[in-house]
């Protein structure tokens, strides 16, 4: 369950933030049980509709979530550095999420401006923190603990994503018979 996303300088996202929690109980909601099982104060939006006109970032949001979930499967950082919009500036990605355990995780990635021809592992600082979700906790309570670093740190291998997988049509074929914008010199 994705709870919160903050992005800066990745793809075209600049100082972007979306939160998918409910601080207060919604009365007469048409969607039932928008909370964690046995954690009724930990509320989240089960349905999120991303709308917008052409070229407003809807597909790019999906691609960003794909990068994140695939990172949790293999720990490859280059998938992020290849999507930094302005290499002269720092880039940041922060995602709060819950798996099938009663833990709130925070993925934090900070990438400094590119100092060499390509990014190295030292340029990319990725940390994953977590805090237990206690019976009476809300998302806001747990996020506050993460903000104050009253939490534990872990690695991507130890996050139980229970097989999260995300693919995109461009990834489905090894024999590509089409070209992408990135490969066409008439596009910047």
Which positions does each model-derived feature cover?
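Pre-Walker A-like glycine/lysine-rich segment at the N-terminus of P-loop NTPase domains
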Residues: 4-66
């Amino acid at each position: 369950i994705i709870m919160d996303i903050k992005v800066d300088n990745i793809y075209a996202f600049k100082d972007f933030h979306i939160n998918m929690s409910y601080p207060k109980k919604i009365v007469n909601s048409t969607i039932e049980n928008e909370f964690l099982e046995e954690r009724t104060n930990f509320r989240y939006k089960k349905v999120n509709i991303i709308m917008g006109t052409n070229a407003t970032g809807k597909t790019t949001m999906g691609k960003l979530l794909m990068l994140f979930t695939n990172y949790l499967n293999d720990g490859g950082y280059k998938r992020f550095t290849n999507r930094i919009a302005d290499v002269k500036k720092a880039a940041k990605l922060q995602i709060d999420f819950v798996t099938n355990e009663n833990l709130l995780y925070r993925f934090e990635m900070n990438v400094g401006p590119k100092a060499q021809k390509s990014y190295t592992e030292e340029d990319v600082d990725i940390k994953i923190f977590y805090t237990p979700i206690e019976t009476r906790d809300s998302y806001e309570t747990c996020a506050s603990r993460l903000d104050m670093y009253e939490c534990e740190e872990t690695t991507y291998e130890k996050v139980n994503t229970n097989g999260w997988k995300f693919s995109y049509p461009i990834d489905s074929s090894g024999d590509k018979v089409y070209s992408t914008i990135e490969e066409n010199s008439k596009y910047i």
